[in-house]
């Protein structure tokens, strides 16, 4: 089997599994005052310190959550509510149409239920957005509560100009959040230097366990909690913390960040070999997303015209190649990718797209296997699409 779906989830690092298992053999609520509780508290604070160190944050800025979706919801809704409460005229969110649904659906929920307004930044054909467009949006509206722009796109791998955009947001006094879930372990991140107010990360995207993430939140940024209870995590995210998962995520973060330069160079070579092979061996195919250096090292996203992505996906799966038609959070939904549509791709082409994403366990044999199977699978999927089109007439 060749696993080419690292953008959906990554295999856990063995060291992260071992670190989690060691904690799971112990007991103790990190909020308890007895010996076991203090031991649990020490472990989670050490995990917090390690994650902060690797991502350029202060330990007090790391708020543990149950994953990337919660982190995005907490940032978008919580910061919006806080800004609106402090300045009632601020009811606008500026974001992009290529965000993950955790951000998009949070924004749309605020529009539908809280009377929020939204300004969508224009998307270029390669999936990028510009700091100039953000400046124009903020100059046009004095009611902006929050800017939210992802650091790197989860489908096509385009890296967005977060440093430049955060400077613009700061100039206008507007807090900015970034979904950096795809960026950890693939790009050098420094939360403190980024100028961001908040940043979302998820453990399972860089070799940690699923079900745990973090929101990095500056101390001077107010965020209304989604949940109420024991007041853990700066009274922003109540609930008994999952110490083992936090430790596993911290261990994975250390491995991913410390090995980032070497791993990115290795993945870039594998990805380029994959891209060159696909473009050479298959007709009527295009690579979606930005070129280097504004593309994640492990991402290759193609449109195979004349076939359905889901059909192609299943043909590949039957031959031992595991990949995706897009975000795993929307897989199985018979709709073209909202990211590709925002990039100007027509619906039919968008439905014929595949994402092949590499990660820390990827090797040359995975690329070889994909290149061996893909041409035949594409040809078969195209024949099936032609037959289906003929039968429907």
From Swiss-Prot:
Gene3D superfamilies: 1.10.260.50, Aspartate Aminotransferase, domain 1, Type I PLP-dependent aspartate aminotransferase-like (Major domain). Its cofactor is pyridoxal 5'-phosphate. The modification N6-(pyridoxal phosphate)lysine is found at residue 205. Pfam families: Aminotran_5 (PF00266). Pyridoxal 5'-phosphate binds at residues 68-69, 154, 182, 202-204, 240. Keywords: Aminotransferase, Iron, Iron-sulfur, Metal-binding, Pyridoxal phosphate, Transferase. SUPFAM superfamilies: PLP-dependent transferases. Disruption phenotype: Cells lacking this gene are microaerophilic and hypersensitive to oxidative stress. Moreover, they show impaired Fe-S cluster-dependent enzyme activity. Its EC number is 2.8.1.7. GO terms for biological process: iron-sulfur cluster assembly. [2Fe-2S] cluster binds at residue 329. The keyword Metal-binding applies. It comes from the Bacteria. The active site is at 329 (cysteine persulfide intermediate). One of its GO terms (molecular function) is cysteine desulfurase activity. InterPro entries: Aminotrans_V_dom, Cysteine_dSase, PyrdxlP-dep_Trfase, PyrdxlP-dep_Trfase_major, PyrdxlP-dep_Trfase_small. IscU is absent from the mycobacterial ISC operon. Homodimer. It interacts with Whib3, Acn, SdhB, FdhF and SirA, other S acceptors. Belongs to the class-V pyridoxal-phosphate-dependent aminotransferase family. NifS/IscS subfamily. Catalyzes the removal of elemental sulfur from cysteine to produce alanine. Participates in the biosynthesis of metalloclusters by providing the inorganic sulfur required for Fe-S core formation. One acceptor is Whib3, on which this enzyme assembles a 4Fe-4S cluster. It can use both L-cysteine and L-selenocysteine as substrates. This is IscS-like cysteine desulfurase. It comes from Mycobacterium tuberculosis (strain ATCC 25618 / H37Rv). The gene is iscS.
